[in-house]
Amino acid sequence: MAELYVKPGNKERGWNDPPQFSYGLQTQAGGPRRSLLTKRVAAPQDGSPRVPASETSPGPPPMGPPPPSSKAPRSPPVGSGPASGVEPTSFPVESEAVMEDVLRPLEQALEDCRGHTRKQVCDDISRRLALLQEQWAGGKLSIPVKKRMALLVQELSSHRWDAADDIHRSLMVDHVTEVSQWMVGVKRLIAEKRSLFSEEAANEEKSAATAEKNHTIPGFQQAS
């Protein structure tokens, strides 16, 4: 290819004359050649050295924790119910026994004993129950005493005499200053009601035995 770009030397010149390049052959073979020089950016007028764009372009700021919110947390509006599917937390509330629920069974037990117990004993029990009602209505009894009395009445109504007597003793030990004036009557009422129940049970058993003894055998006729 070198011979296409070089013309033979001038015969009239010396042997060491340099060859002459043909510009026309160069343009025909390769076309216009691009200049390898790049454009230079003019220097800034203020005279400060120019920094490449890659060094001056700021990157994204570092991510830090979000700033605290200046707004206080808003409470839910009044009257708004809980979210669906979530039940409100229920706190156990200590229920207080009702005075009528305790006194009514005791008075009924006293009425059952009348006619089977001496009048003096029944009158003393009635007076003690009146003191119990007075102190209860006056707010002089604590919640533990009221709750134990409710349990005592349940055991008494169910004819569980030993359990009722155990509750009576626990009240005398733990709350003697509250119950000493009327608990004696409750204790006597438990004993009288227990005795009456045992007597009634014995009478029923005796009556059943007598009825069985006097029962006529089917098909058997006594001689007239």
Swiss-Prot record:
<keyword id="KW-0675">Receptor</keyword>
<dbReference type="GO" id="GO:0005634">
    <property type="term" value="C:nucleus"/>
</dbReference>
<dbReference type="InterPro" id="IPR009917">
    <property type="entry name" value="SRA1/Sec31"/>
</dbReference>
<keyword id="KW-0804">Transcription</keyword>
<dbReference type="GO" id="GO:0002153">
    <property type="term" value="F:steroid receptor RNA activator RNA binding"/>
</dbReference>
<protein>
    <recommendedName>
        <fullName>Steroid receptor RNA activator 1</fullName>
    </recommendedName>
</protein>
<dbReference type="GO" id="GO:0005929">
    <property type="term" value="C:cilium"/>
</dbReference>
<dbReference type="GO" id="GO:0005886">
    <property type="term" value="C:plasma membrane"/>
</dbReference>
<dbReference type="Pfam" id="PF07304">
    <property type="entry name" value="SRA1"/>
</dbReference>
<dbReference type="GO" id="GO:0043231">
    <property type="term" value="C:intracellular membrane-bounded organelle"/>
</dbReference>
<dbReference type="InterPro" id="IPR040243">
    <property type="entry name" value="Steroid_recept_RNA_1"/>
</dbReference>
<dbReference type="GO" id="GO:0015630">
    <property type="term" value="C:microtubule cytoskeleton"/>
</dbReference>
<keyword id="KW-0963">Cytoplasm</keyword>
<dbReference type="GO" id="GO:0006915">
    <property type="term" value="P:apoptotic process"/>
</dbReference>
<feature type="compositionally biased region" description="Pro residues">
    <location>
        <begin position="58"/>
        <end position="76"/>
    </location>
</feature>
<comment type="subunit">
    <text>SRA1 RNA exists in a ribonucleoprotein complex containing NCOA1. The RNA also forms a complex with PUS1 and RARG in the nucleus. Interacts with AR.</text>
</comment>
<feature type="region of interest" description="Disordered">
    <location>
        <begin position="201"/>
        <end position="224"/>
    </location>
</feature>
<keyword id="KW-0597">Phosphoprotein</keyword>
<dbReference type="GO" id="GO:0045171">
    <property type="term" value="C:intercellular bridge"/>
</dbReference>
<dbReference type="GO" id="GO:0005737">
    <property type="term" value="C:cytoplasm"/>
</dbReference>
<keyword id="KW-0687">Ribonucleoprotein</keyword>
<feature type="compositionally biased region" description="Basic and acidic residues">
    <location>
        <begin position="201"/>
        <end position="215"/>
    </location>
</feature>
<keyword id="KW-0539">Nucleus</keyword>
<feature type="modified residue" description="Phosphoserine">
    <location>
        <position position="75"/>
    </location>
</feature>
<keyword id="KW-0010">Activator</keyword>
<feature type="modified residue" description="Phosphoserine">
    <location>
        <position position="48"/>
    </location>
</feature>
<dbReference type="GO" id="GO:0003713">
    <property type="term" value="F:transcription coactivator activity"/>
</dbReference>
<feature type="modified residue" description="Phosphoserine">
    <location>
        <position position="57"/>
    </location>
</feature>
<dbReference type="GO" id="GO:0005654">
    <property type="term" value="C:nucleoplasm"/>
</dbReference>
<feature type="region of interest" description="Disordered">
    <location>
        <begin position="1"/>
        <end position="90"/>
    </location>
</feature>
<dbReference type="GO" id="GO:0005829">
    <property type="term" value="C:cytosol"/>
</dbReference>
<keyword id="KW-0053">Apoptosis</keyword>
<dbReference type="GO" id="GO:0045662">
    <property type="term" value="P:negative regulation of myoblast differentiation"/>
</dbReference>
<comment type="function">
    <text>Functional RNA which acts as a transcriptional coactivator that selectively enhances steroid receptor-mediated transactivation ligand-independently through a mechanism involving the modulating N-terminal domain (AF-1) of steroid receptors. Also mediates transcriptional coactivation of steroid receptors ligand-dependently through the steroid-binding domain (AF-2). Enhances cellular proliferation and differentiation and promotes apoptosis in vivo. May play a role in tumorigenesis.</text>
</comment>
<comment type="similarity">
    <text>Belongs to the SRA1 family.</text>
</comment>
<keyword id="KW-0805">Transcription regulation</keyword>
